Amino acid sequence: MTLADLPRFSPRGLLRSGAERRAAAEQLRALNTVPDDPGRITRELSGGNQQKVVLARWLMHECRVLLLDEPTRGVDVGAKAEIYRVVTELSAAGIGVVVVSSELSELAGLCTRVLVMREGEVVAAVDGAAATEHELLRHAVAPTDTEPVLEEIK
């Protein structure tokens, strides 16, 4: 797959016009993907840029909700910052973003609300302002008999 395979206009991975190629290049530039050449083979990119290509692919579909599972695992600090910037902008634009992450600092910094799960059950809902690493970890490891389990999330 190349970077040009991103747009929703090319379901078989073949671009039909320069407009689609320009749209792919624009999305890659918006994510600061290096290089932003839509003809570049994705697997030749760094891990961080590969993650940004995957994100760009979904953004080209104009999704209203994104589910990001470990979006920054294995990427460098610069790519993490770029992904965080994009997630924050998407959320501010009204796009629903659900982030699944084992990095507590990531959740504390990105989320307006964090649901903490333990053994397949939601054990706490923490507002973004109160979502510190310490608070999230406290809920994640608290003994079940002393921590009430959420029955309903409103």
Regions found by a protein language model. Give the residues of each.
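Glycine-rich phosphate-binding loops of nucleotide-dependent enzymes
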Residues: 1-154
